[in-house]
Amino acid sequence: MSDNLYTYGVIEQEDIELEIDGVAGAERVYTVDYRTLSAVVSDIDTTDPERTDEDVQVHNTVLQHVLEYDGGRTVVPMSFGMAFKNGRTLKGVMRGARRALRSALNDIEGTVELGVKIITSSEGGVSHDAIRADIGDRLSELSINETENDLFSDRLVVNKSYLVARDRRDDFDAAIDTIEEEYGDELTVQYTGPWAPYNFVDIHIGADQQRGR
């Protein structure tokens, strides 16, 4: 049996075991500890997993389970494909990245990421700048941080990720509901999450580190 470990993210030290599907057909998800940190992992037979739509969805679903575990956990997410040769290699990477991981956990403690796309019903009508200003003001005051994502369509006027404290989540939800009610058919709101805060952490792990080189 392979000792390879697929890694979803890092949390404060805690023993967690989830009987849920993992990437590449894994049947359970559990934690590997290094000092005050725990990596959320599952077993895998390779250090170079194939990226499929199904497994990307599984990766995100596992992170959502951790986010919601026993009232909610703060998690520093790893990008898809972070698989390590064995537990020793993983712990070595955690040791080297400990300060960055600790800083990231502190920065996002008690938060989730929420995605908001606003699409106009036509290219005419309400000013796009006015929509951006109005919605931006409403949502910015309910969030800790935000990032701008690509506006890949002329009708896409807002595409942002928001870092929101868990205790402001209901307020943020209510603001989205109000926006939908007030703008009616003029806008379509695509509201997603909660997600692990991918857009608000910046930790890089190279292929050589994954393979223990």
From Swiss-Prot:
Induction: Transcribed from early-log phase, decreases as cells enter stationary phase, probably as a long gvpF-gvpM RNA. Highly expressed in 25% salt, poorly expressed in 15% salt, no gas vesicles are formed at 15% salt. Accumulates in exponential but not stationary phase (at protein level). Keywords: Gas vesicle. Belongs to the gas vesicle GvpF/GvpL family. InterPro entries: GvpL/GvpF. It comes from the Archaea. A minor component of the gas vesicle, may be involved in preventing GvpA aggregation during gas vesicle nucleation. Gas vesicles are hollow, gas filled proteinaceous nanostructures found in some microorganisms. They allow positioning of halobacteria at the optimal depth for growth in the poorly aerated, shallow brine pools of their habitat. Expression of a 9.5 kb mc-vac DNA fragment containing 2 divergently transcribed regions (gvpD-gvpE-gvpF-gvpG-gvpH-gvpI-gvpJ-gvpK-gvpL-gvpM and gvpA-gvpC-gvpN-gvpO) allows H.volcanii to produce gas vesicles. Signal peptide: none annotated. Pfam families: GvpL_GvpF. The keyword Translocase does not apply. It is found in: Gas vesicle. This is Gas vesicle protein F. GO terms for biological process: gas vesicle organization. Encoded in a 14-gene locus called mc-vac. Disulfide bonds: none annotated. The keyword DNA repair does not apply. Binds GvpA. It comes from Haloferax mediterranei (strain ATCC 33500 / DSM 1411 / JCM 8866 / NBRC 14739 / NCIMB 2177 / R-4). One of its GO terms (cellular component) is gas vesicle. The gene is gvpF.
